[in-house]
Amino acid sequence: MPELSVILPARNAAGTIARAVASTLAAMPADSELVVGNDSSSDSTVGEAIRGASRGGVVDPRLRIEDITPGEGGVSRVLTQLMERTDSRLVGRMDADDVSLKGRFKRTMRAIERGDDMVFTQMIELRGSRPVPRMPYEITPEDMGWHLLLTNPVCHPTMLATREIIDRVGGYRAVPAEDYDLWMRVASAGGRIRRLAAWGLLYRIHLGQVTGNKAWRSDSWKNPDQAQAF
């Protein structure tokens, strides 16, 4: 088994996934895999993912594509299936419309080896073609709990975590904010969560994002399971 599996949910992402795949493979160590979960895409998502992993007609063997079983649960369903189909010690995340920056995994893996359970990098927002860097300051495990009570201070597709901590708290759940719900349960279980100051991702901002929807935000706070984690 590889040391690291980076899981990437994708649905009709043909316009962006090639760059997401290429940049992530470029940032990943040799002993790793990038596992794309194709969630019933009706466009050329799979072909574009393969194109992003190809150099000189050769596909990077670290790319693996998994067809996701349809059903309810949204992205949490995809992530759960990808967790079940991988067995690496470390788990990373990536989204199909973002861009990984070089050095991302080297920095986060170093923090894991120093004793953290879950590590994030800071991000640079990509608003159209305009990059907007977020303030590059670190949040230590000692301070993370306070930050989580006030807001979600970390970006899911920058995550690197031990599989052990994710499994210990029950993995992803079918709630509106499956990422924040996981962070809260990890923190409550005594997990060490850190956000590094360094930028590790270009995070694309666009109108269609679910998290920017007011109805989603309302449903998120009303969900009883998520409220219990908080």
Give residue ranges: language-model regions.
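Short, acidic, metal-binding catalytic loop of nucleotide-sugar glycosyltransferases
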Residues: A22-D31
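Short aromatic/hydrophobic "clamp" motif used to bind/position activated sugar donors
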Residues: V91
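Conserved nucleotide-sugar donor-binding catalytic segment
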Residues: D143-S220
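Cell-envelope/extracellular polymer assembly enzymes that use nucleotide-activated donors
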Residues: E3-S5, E33, D181
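Conserved donor NDP-sugar-binding/catalytic core segment of glycosyltransferases
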Residues: G103-P133
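A conserved acidic beta->alpha catalytic loop
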Residues: N38-E48, E72, D95
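Short beta-strand/loop segment that forms part of the nucleotide-sugar
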Residues: D31-S40, E66-I68, A96
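Glycine-rich, basic loop-to-helix element that forms the pyrophosphate-binding segment
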Residues: I68-T86
